[in-house]
Amino acid sequence: MSNVIGDRTEDGLSTAAAASGSTAVQSSPPTDRPVRVYADGIYDLFHFGHARSLEQAKLAFPNNTYLLVGCCNDETTHKYKGRTVMTAEERYESLRHCKWVDEVIPDAPWVVNQEFLDKHQIDYVAHDSLPYADSSGAGKDVYEFVKKVGRFKETQRTEGISTSDIIMRIVKDYNQYVMRNLDRGYSREDLGVSFVKEKRLRVNMRLKKLQERVKEQQERVGEKIQTVKMLRNEWVENADRWVAGFLEIFEEGCHKMGTAIVDSIQERLMRQKSAERLENGQDDDTDDQFYEEYFDHDMGSDDDEDEKFYDEEEVKEEETEKTVMTDAKDNK
């Protein structure tokens, strides 16, 4: 018989089949037909550890393998193992939906004997090599017989997963699962919870939700404070650059505004002068001459001003000479 893969301890087994660890010489598998491998167990809360152990049994031999899986009924299991979560029919049905299983044997015996092997034409029994205490009192190890006759096929366990571990997770978070089911419409009677415990659980859940909301708000406030700090640091780092840019733009605008004001004043002065000349009867030529004189005055050089100064001095000297000569004649 091949490895027993659904274990009675409800622990999962790994998928790679290992060499036999039994001291007896292992019998040779048949070559004219598929090898019939048997695996048994409780398979409560069927999980991937169970599936991997069944995969090991199915792939224990290179040729075609026919895998039979035995599952103990509720009476036998409760007597030697303890209470299960799933009923026997639920456990049988879980096994039937595993792709590695060819046949499910319900009401399997707690200890495999020669009569059972002959009845189902079993070649090998598959299970891990660790001794499994026989609580029925028939022997020290449930698989002691098949190991002695060389019809035991060893498998490896899958660490980290077992039915007991799953139950422990549920027990650990029992209150949360109770509240979840109460919120989904289950009554406290369905869950076996007293009135006082139900109220206490609801109060605790409200307090927990309040704590979660407070924590969420604190995180949001912290994020906003961090954002403000980042913006402040960015403003401080770029303040000088922003101020310099503003002053440059402001100075350029003031220069343009000053130029526009000067041009406007000059234009108004020219218009006013032109209007005065027209009132005095001067023609357009005189007006043009005024423009020329105006621009010449604005754009004239210092040399032109010097020439005008010397001309005026010469005129004054001539007038002085004339006055002196006139006075001399009068004295004569």
UniProtKB/Swiss-Prot annotation:
Coiled coil: none annotated. SUPFAM superfamilies: Nucleotidylyl transferase (SSF52374). Transmembrane segments: none annotated. Optimum temperature is 30 degrees Celsius. Keywords: Acetylation, Lipid biosynthesis, Lipid metabolism, Nucleotidyltransferase, Phospholipid biosynthesis, Phospholipid metabolism, Transferase. Pfam families: CTP_transf_like. Residues 14-28 have a biased composition (Low complexity). Residues 281-293, 301-318 have a biased composition (Acidic residues). Pathway: Phospholipid metabolism; phosphatidylcholine biosynthesis; phosphatidylcholine from phosphocholine: step 1/2. Substrate binds at K81, W110. It catalyses: phosphocholine + CTP + H(+) = CDP-choline + diphosphate. Its EC number is 2.7.7.15. GO terms for molecular function: choline-phosphate cytidylyltransferase activity. Residues 1-32, 276-332 are annotated as: Disordered. Plays an important role in the biosynthesis of the phospholipid phosphatidylcholine. Catalyzes the formation of CDP-choline. Belongs to the cytidylyltransferase family. NCBIfam families: cyt_tran_rel (TIGR00125). This is Choline-phosphate cytidylyltransferase 1. It comes from Arabidopsis thaliana (Mouse-ear cress). The gene is CCT1.
